[in-house]
Every structure is written in C-alpha cells, then in structure tokens.
Amino acid sequence: MSDIALTVSVLALVAVVGLWIGNIKVRGVGFGIGGVLFGGIIVGHFVDQAGVTLSGDMLHFIQEFGLILFVYTIGIQVGPGFFASLRVSGLRLNLFAVLIVIMGGLVTAILHKIFAIPLPVVLGIFSGAVTNTPALGAGQQILRDLGTPVDLVDQMGMSYAMAYPFGICGILLTMWLMRLIFRVNVEAEAQKHESSLANGHSLIQTMNIRVENPNLNNMAIQDVPILNSDKIICSRLKRDDTLMVPSPGTIIQAGDLLHLVGQPTDLHNAQLVIGKEVDTSLSTRGTDLRVERVVVTNEKVLGKRIRDLHFKERYDVVISRLNRAGVELVASSDASLQFGDILNLVGRPASIDAVANVVGNAQQKLQQVQMLPVFIGIGLGVLLGSIPLFVPGFPVALKLGLAGGPLIMALILGRIGSIGKLYWFMPPSANLALRELGIVLFLAVVGLKSGGDFVDTLTQGEGLSWIGYGIFITEIPLITVGLLARIFAKMNYLTLCGMLAGSMTDPPALAFANNLHATSGAAALSYATVYPLVMFLRIITPQLLAVIFWGMG
C-alpha cells in the first residue's frame, strides 16, 4: 500500500474511533467532536508501536487545511452577528468574556515563569484548558515561524490533549458551583430573563392604534414624523370595513386603524402621538390581502436598498419585517438586502407573487453552495494571515496565520453578505458539514502525532503536572469572573452560564447550559453574543504569549 493510501486509511480509522468516543455521554455530557483527538492518540499509539510510517507532508497539509476549513466556516456563520454583538447591547457580556480570556493568559504566563514550563508545552496546556482547537493551530503556526523544532511543536498537541478533558469538565463544574453558591432557582431565572426581553429593545412587536389625534386628520403618512422613520413600519390601514396597504402618500383620517411594526419603545412613542391602542383585529382573513414570507435569492437585488426597489409604488406591497440570520428586524427603507434574507410581505396575492419573482424566493437555492466564493474567501484569508505585522522589540513579525486570517476574512465577508453576483451565504447544513470535516481532519492529525509518546508522558513524564496546570488555567478565570458577574453585575444565571460556555467556545458546555431549562434561550443567546469576539481573541492570545515568552527567554 502506498504512503498516501495508508495515511488516508489511518485517518479514516481515527475519525471512526474518535467520533464513536465523542458520542459516548455521561449524564448527557460527552467530548463531542473533541473525541477525535483521543481517537487519534489511541490509534497513534498503536501505529507507533507497530512501526508504521505515515506521510509527514500529507499529514501536515491535511492538518492545516482542516484548520482553515474550520475557522473559515465559523467566520461565515457568525459574521452577520459579529459586529452587532460588539454594540452596547452585548458590551457587558463581551467585557466579562474578554476578562476571562485575559485572566487565562495571565495565569498561563505566571505558571510558565514559576515552573519553567517549556513554551510549546505551556501553549498546548493553555489551548486544551480553554478547549479551543484553533488556538492550538495558531500556537503551532507561530512556533514554527519562530524556528521551533518539529518534535517540540508536536509536544504542544500532547499537552493540549492532557489538559482538554478537564477543560470540558471544569466549565460544567463552575456552572454547578455558581448554582450552589447563590442557591439559584433555575425556573425563576428563566422567567426573569423572559420578562427582561419583553421590556427590552431586542424584540420586534406589533400594535394596532386608532387615530384619535385631531392634528393628524387628513395628513399623509409621510408627513407624520413618527411614521416616516426607519423605526416604525405601517403595514396595514383599516378604514371602516376596508383593509388596505398604505403608501407614504396615503391620507389618514380620524378613526383609522393602523397596524404598526417596530420595537416596543418606538411603538409606545407612536401610540402617544397617534391615539389609542385597540384590540381590533387587522387580520387579512376574509379580505383581498394576504401576508406571506419570501426569501431573497435573486443575485440582481443583492446589496440594493429596500427604498430603491419601489415595491410599494410598483406593486402596492409593503415589507413589514426582515429576518436576517434568525434575527427579526424592522424593514427600514435604508436596509440593504442580503442573500437568505426573509421578507414579510403584505399585499394582494398577485402583487406578492410579482415581488417574490423579483427577489427570487427560490427555496432550492438556499440548499446550494456557491463554491467560487468559498475558495475566494479562503484564498483571501490565507493571504491576510500571511501579512507580517512588525512590532518593535519582537523577534519575529506577528501574523494572523492560517487560523486567524481566514477567520477575520470570513467575518468580514459574512457581514458584507454579497459582492455583485457573489454571495457568501452558506446553508447551515453545508456550513456544519464543512466545519465538522475540517475539525475532524485537524484533530485526527494532532492526535496521531501525539499518540506515540502520550502513554509514556502520562505515566512516566510530566503528564500529571500538565493536567494540574490546566486545572488552574481553566478554573481561576471562570470562577473569578462568574462571582464578579453574579455579585456585582447581578447577571441572570442562565445568561451567565451561556457567557461562560461562550468564553471557552465550548459546545458541550452550551449543551449542558441549554439543558438547565427546557424552553429558555438565555444561555444560547449570551453564548452567541460573546462567541465571535472570544474566538478571535483565543486565536490571537497564544501567538502573543509565544512571541512575548520567546523574547523574554
């Protein structure tokens, strides 16, 4: 059997064994995709014992390409929400998550200096303790750039594997301790979160208002400031028994019923100006109007603003809402359409069909992947990661590397959405498939390279002390920030659990947090809020630590 065939066969065996290990769960918690690392260690041990030689160049390529696929698809997935998460609404959560990352780096630096832990080993312990695989890849990349011998770089994978198991268990232990210390009632916390959402600014709601302000009688909608804004959409108007789709030039009269869409505060302000909220239904049932959701798939409208498409003037159709990446938004006239946007249309059936044809509404396109943008994005990401950043006093130039470059580029492209006929939308199923393939390939190779010496290191070497160092790196930041967030910021327990899981970019921990309450989405929401920024910082941190330690050494 050729070297290539043998290498592929062994990798396939690693994936099978590792995924099987990952599916084993104790009390609903397992290693998940991280099981592939341990599958690689097991197979790597026996491959080494048997004296089998695999293709080193091929393993190196597969490891790097797998990492690129993984971080790129993560960036495309979270890109649309990344920059929004940095705004004020998620600022507090992100600050606490950043504090966890910084404290983890400080603990790592202190351990490195006190116990004289070799640089590759301490970086591997750091990556495993925070359960972040891209950090492992970024650390190995910068060590190679610094001229570290290959056998020492491979030690990073071994120390990562030592620290990884407690990294997963440690976050779950922290959640349990927070619940025990503060005697948390999970049901009460879920109800508090729901009530805070209802009073917040994040939910799009509707309100039916009767026009009672005499100053508005016989005025056009466009002349009423609160209605002629990007915060409120008037999608229906009922006069006597007639329901119509209003346009900016529609004249409103006293007694008209307006169906408004917007955020709660804006709707309340509109009600104070216009009149009184009523319970009267403005349903399209029994009328010649209907409400329908269509999806944007036509490349010709991508990037165009809603106002420039003139749907109301041409088709007598109003867009009442816009759903982007699962987030409901007010369909402001300045909003630009992106591939995969879901539009809520109000109008007559024939008119809605006409608008649907304009925007595409081809459901099958949502299941197709444009491969050209994928490779353009990966290529640009690799180029970005290769740009040297020279910092005075540092022995080598800093680089985003093969982990950071594709991630940053994917975040930018995911936020842009489309350029001309190229769109970076990727169906969730395709994104997940590429992401899982990438991380399986990466972890399989890391495990194989670590497996030969793993048992000896654990039983006769420094393995147990590495595990101990990892426990400090995992627990000190989590417990400290958890206490600060709960005591001083009065953070909701479920939100806190999601933030802690997100700060470690740990899907098994998120699964555990979600299972704390069957219906609350608090943990998932906070996890998604901090995940993009934390993922970026987790990739940059080992590179900074490596360069700083190298310069000090």
Swiss-Prot record:
Q: Which UniProt keywords apply?
A: Cell membrane, Membrane, Repeat, Transmembrane, Transmembrane helix, Transport
Q: Where would you find this protein in the cell? A: Cell membrane
Q: Could you list the residue ranges that cross the membrane?
A: 4-24, 28-48, 65-85, 95-115, 158-178, 371-391, 393-413, 437-457, 464-484, 493-513, 533-553
Q: How does it sit in the membrane?
A: Multi-pass membrane protein
Zinc among keywords: no
InterPro entries linked = AAE_transporter, RCK_C, RCK_C_sf, Transpt_YidE_put, YidE_YbjL
Which superkingdom is the protein from? Bacteria
Keyword Thylakoid attached: no
Which family is it part of? Answer: Belongs to the AAE transporter (TC 2.A.81) family. YidE subfamily.
Q: Which HAMAP family match?
A: YidE
Q: What is this protein called?
A: Putative transport protein YidE
Q: Which organism is it from?
A: Salmonella dublin (strain CT_02021853)
Ranked from the top, the taxonomy reads:
Bacteria, Pseudomonadati, Pseudomonadota, Gammaproteobacteria, Enterobacterales
